[in-house]
């Protein structure tokens, strides 16, 4: 089929980073080795490994990791024969010190992530990553919450800092296909670097959104095997690969092996099956950061309020990633209102 780029499509598997939210950041080294080895043997291009909130995310606010993420990254690098290991870094959570550590133990790609209106805070990290010899992408989170014009403006900043690609990152799983098309098309017409798309499946359109992004020229896409990612997960990698194969894309990833990875390697790790439940559905509907789900559910239980009310209120306040402390504040306020009624 016709698409607006001649570059090959490359996939980053995010189940060992985005999926860390689902696992409450309790991945073991053995699990990371097992999953990485299977993905590598299937031909996966990139495998992202780090705390769910990126390098340096193991804190009381974001959730403590069971195993130091550098050990997990090192283990993943050790298992790879052809895939490259990627990491996520959110300025303000991760630092250039942690980025240097990750590079020294073999991480080859870093995605530097900021809120969609705050690309300026990524300059130092992008430039430093280039100095380290890493492949560097910008990652504009909560892309649904800004105008197309603002998105283009911020993407151009990341390009000027040295990013080799910029992702439209649908952190809330709130974008619909026509909105993805509009954003990717605008970036393709404005940038001279690659464009990526990272979706979440909270409204059950992650695969459709990813296909739309590819049609408009995105060449870097994300997936999570068995939807092992925050909220309702991301575009389900093995499903996405099957769709792409039907459409004529040859990505040199073994579809049968990826089905086996999903069924035999990743599925047994899931605390519960990844499906669109009311919490993740509300996040997509309200436009709330997908990693907020478990935090909101815990706060709801603590304050005896409905998690959906918490998420809707967070959406109204346009709370962004990094403001997890607001979840408890909102829950407490809702509980107080409930008592007064």
Swiss-Prot record:
Catalytic activity: (S)-4-hydroxy-2-oxopentanoate = acetaldehyde + pyruvate
Active site: 21
Family annotation (SUPFAM superfamilies): Aldolase (SSF51569), post-HMGL domain-like (SSF89000)
Top-level taxon of origin: Bacteria
Residues the record marks as site: Transition state stabilizer: 17
A Pfam family annotated for this UniProt entry: HMGL-like
Keyword list, A-Z: Aromatic hydrocarbons catabolism, Lyase, Manganese, Metal-binding
Binding site for Mn(2+): 18, 198, 200
Binding site for substrate: 17-18, 171, 198, 289
EC number: 4.1.3.39
GO biological process: catabolic process; L-leucine biosynthetic process
Domain Pyruvate carboxyltransferase span(s) in chain numbering: 9-259
MF terms in GO: 2-isopropylmalate synthase activity; 4-hydroxy-2-oxovalerate aldolase activity; manganese ion binding
NCBIfam families: 4OH_2_O_val_ald (TIGR03217), PRK08195.1 (NF006049)
Entry's family note: Belongs to the 4-hydroxy-2-oxovalerate aldolase family.
Name this protein carries in UniProt: 4-hydroxy-2-oxovalerate aldolase
Protein source organism: Bacillus thuringiensis (strain Al Hakam)
């Amino acid at each position: 089929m016709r698409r607006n780029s001649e570059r090959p499509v490359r996939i980053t598997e995010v189940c060992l980073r985005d999926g860390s939210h689902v696992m409450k950041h309790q991945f073991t080294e053995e699990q990371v080795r097992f999953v990485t080895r299977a993905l590598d043997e299937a031909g996966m291009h990139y495998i992202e490994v780090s705390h769910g909130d990126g390098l340096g995310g193991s804190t009381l606010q974001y959730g403590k990791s069971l195993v130091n993420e550098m050990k997990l990254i090192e283990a993943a690098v050790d298992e790879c024969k052809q895939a490259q290991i990627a990491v996520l870094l959110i300025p303000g959570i991760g630092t250039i010190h942690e980025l240097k550590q990750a590079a020294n133990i073999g991480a080859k790609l870093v995605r530097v992530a900021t809120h969609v209106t705050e690309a300026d805070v990524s300059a130092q990290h992008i430039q430093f990553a280039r100095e380290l010899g890493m492949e560097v992408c910008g990652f504009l989170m909560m892309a649904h919450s800004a105008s197309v014009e603002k998105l283009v403006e911020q993407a151009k900043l990341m390009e000027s800092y040295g990013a080799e690609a910029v992702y439209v990152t649908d952190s809330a799983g709130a974008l619909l296909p026509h909105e993805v098309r509009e954003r990717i098309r605008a970036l393709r017409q404005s940038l001279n670097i690659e464009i990526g798309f990272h979706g979440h499946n909270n409204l059950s359109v992650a695969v459709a959104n990813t296909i739309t992004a590819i049609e408009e020229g995105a060449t870097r896409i994300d997936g999570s095997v068995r939807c092992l990612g925050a909220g309702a997960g991301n575009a389900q990698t093995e499903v996405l690969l099957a769709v792409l194969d039907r459409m004529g894309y040859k990505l040199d990833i073994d579809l049968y092996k990826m089905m086996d990875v999903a069924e035999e390697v990743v599925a047994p790790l899931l605390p519960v099956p990844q499906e669109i439940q009311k919490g993740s559905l509300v996040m997509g509907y309200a436009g709330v950061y997908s990693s907020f789900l478990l935090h909101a559910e815990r706060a709801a239980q603590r304050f005896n309020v409905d998690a959906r009310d918490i998420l809707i209120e967070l959406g109204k306040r346009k709370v962004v990633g990094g403001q997890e402390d607001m979840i408890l504040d909102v829950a407490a306020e809702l509980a107080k209102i409930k008592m007064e009624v």
